[in-house]
From Swiss-Prot:
This is Aspartate--tRNA(Asp/Asn) ligase. It comes from the Bacteria. Homodimer. Belongs to the class-II aminoacyl-tRNA synthetase family. Type 1 subfamily. The gene is aspS.
Length: 586
């Protein structure tokens, strides 16, 4: 009787015992009167020795990635044949029976990490690519993480509830994927960009703790960290403040990182306001794995004769600097030109620099800083071989963002980023609105259901631009991992927000009437967050693309080479739906 086991179950106790394993053939080695088959299942690899004449005839027909059943005797390898790189490298199975379960066609690419297959080819044969250990292990880790999330939240009395995937189209910034209704011709459902409104309705229904591993959909251009369909941990709680949500997420992530990749996170994550993050790092999702920080030098240059700085300060703009210690010799003219191109992209008044040599400014704009030279050297503790970069703009945010991108570029070029670090950061107190100078209109900075901070509510309409919301983001290594807020639970306040962003009563009733009605029936104060599962696993596994951690992702054109979707449908289907296809060129 053969004991059915998996490859990882081979051990000393099974020596000289009969075992049976079902697996795929990873490698074949012919050695005259015997053949070695390296086999693989989901759990591990193992080696099979074939030396009986009748079995050799079968083994000679076997090719790579055949699915086979092996029955045999587990034996120890000779000392000179032990493979220390395999967990099962001390054993091999002496084959007694071989059954070919299924053959495999000629492979489109080798099932190895260093194959040169194109992305489209790998996606077309995703079921083969998933046999690679590195890819397989990422998917398994994802499964472990979501299992931990569920257990963690259920233990804390959260309810896992499912919200609809056919919803009313209420665009949240990106385009909706729409679904035509056959029954209601001319009408459309949308696939949800998030369960936002439904999770708020769940709070109004009295379920005070909700979560969902939610599938979400956005019709936007694909890029490295985005897909048209994605997964997020969506959760909401009644009667909470943001600090309650911070603590919950910190404890959950501590558990996930410890159990999945054996990393001990701090029990509490660092926190910073949006304004401080912009001033210090030039980003609302700063990478804090390195210390390179922005500083505002406007006060020190208030009497500057350099026209760019003089005009900026006259217009109440901002001058930002970045000091790189003891690295001036690393910045050639060509490298500085590359940094200047980044500044141009952000339409700043340019990027300027000077170096410190012989305790004086040298090169760049040194000649324009003679008056302030010694004061700046003393104030900023400048030393020989330091270099200072300056950028100026009439708009504070533009100056910050430009220098923030330059900060990242410098850190990458100088190797300042510790790739083994996991640096979490809460960014909070975001502006509630964004203002478009061209259209002279306001739009939500995050979404239109976030609560303004208490001190801004009374005079909300007088100065929307300065209104701060109860909004927070969770950042990991410079990537926005999650976003949340305390929500509006008052109909009147929600209507005021709608009006500021240009939704007059008729429009707000048409799009959100069902939700406004619900706010009239005893809505609790509530708040929540959504954490991107795909991004989380991508960062935990140090993957370069989000596609690596999704089982069946789309390519960069939001298409699937595996099943050739999206595809055209028949004229009969179109007729049933009441749809006519119009040539886009007409």
């Amino acid at each position: 009787m053969f004991k059915v086991i998996k490859c990882n179950e081979l051990n000393e106790k099974l020596i000289d015992k009969k075992v049976e394993i079902n697996a795929w053939v990873k490698k074949i080695r012919h050695h005259g009167k015997f053949i070695f088959l390296n086999i693989r299942d989901r759990y591990e690899k193992a080696q099979v020795l074939v030396n009986e004449e009748k079995l050799l005839k079968i083994a000679e027909k076997i090719k790579l990635e055949y699915c086979i059943k092996i029955q045999g005797l587990l034996i120890k390898r000779p000392p000179n044949m032990i493979n220390a790189n395999m967990k099962t490298g001390h054993f091999e199975i002496l084959a007694k029976n071989i059954e070919i379960i299924s053959k495999c066609n000629e492979l489109p690419f080798m099932i190895e990490d260093d194959n040169n297959a194109s992305e489209n080819s790998k996606l077309e044969y995703r079921y083969l690519d998933l046999r690679r250990d590195s890819l397989k292990n990422k998917i398994i880790l994802r499964c472990q993480a979501t299992h931990l999330i569920r257990n963690f939240l259920i233990k804390r009395k959260f309810l896992e509830l499912e919200t609809p995937t056919f919803v009313k189209s209420t665009p949240e910034g990106a385009r909706d994927f729409v679904i035509p209704s056959r029954i209601h011709k001319g009408s459309f459902y949308a696939l949800p960009q998030s369960p936002q409104l439904y999770k708020q309705l769940i709070m109004i229904a009295g379920f005070d703790k909700y979560f969902q591993i939610a599938r979400c959909y956005r019709d936007e251009d694909s890029r490295g960290d985005r897909q048209p369909e994605f997964t997020q941990l969506d959760l909401e709680m009644s009667f909470v403040k943001k600090e309650n949500i911070f603590k919950l997420i910190e404890n959950m992530l501590f558990l996930i990182f410890k159990n999945c990749i054996n990393i001990n996170l701090p029990k509490k994550f660092k926190k910073i306001t949006y304004k401080k993050a912009m001033n210090k790092y030039g980003s609302d999702k700063p990478d804090t794995r390195f210390e390179l920080e922005l500083q505002d030098i406007s006060r020190n240059l208030k009497n500057s004769e350099f026209n760019i700085f003089k005009d900026t300060l006259k217009n109440k703009g901002s001058i930002k600097i970045l000091i790189v210690k003891d690295k001036a010799d690393k910045f050639s003219r060509a490298k500085i030109n590359n940094l200047e191109e980044i500044a141009k992209l952000y339409k700043t008044q340019g990027l300027y620099f000077t170096k410190i040599e012989n305790n004086k400014f040298s090169g760049g704009i040194a000649k324009f800083l003679k008056t302030e030279e010694q004061e700046l050297i003393k104030t900023y503790s400048l030393e020989n071989n330091d270099i200072i970069f300056f950028t100026a703009n009439n708009n504070w945010e533009t100056a910050c963002k430009a220098m923030g991108q330059i900060r990242i570029k410098i850190a990458n070029d100088l190797g300042l980023i510790d790739e083994n670090k996991f640096e979490f950061l809460w960014v909070y107190d975001f502006p509630l609105f964004e203002y478009d100078e061209n259209t002279k209109t306001y739009s939500p900075a995050h979404h239109m259901f976030s609560l303004p901070k208490k001190q801004y509510i009374a005079n909300l309409e007088k100065n929307p631009k300065k209104t701060i919301g109860e909004i927070y983001d969770l950042v990991l290594n410079g990537v926005e991992l999650g976003s949340g807020s305390i929500r509006i639970h008052n109909k009147e306040l929600q209507q005021r927000i709608f009006k500021i962003i240009g939704f007059q009563k008729e429009k707000s009733e048409d799009r959100f009437g069902f939700f406004l009605k619900a706010l009239e029936y005893g809505a609790p104060n509530h708040g929540g967050i959504a954490i991107g599962i795909d991004r989380l696993i991508m960062l935990m596994t140090k993957s370069t693309s989000i596609k690596d951690v999704i089982l069946f992702p789309k390519n960069s054109f939001a298409a699937s080479p595996l099943d050739n979707s999206p595809s055209k449908i028949s004229n009969e289907q179109l007729k049933e739906l009441g749809i006519n296809i119009v040539d886009g060129d007409n």
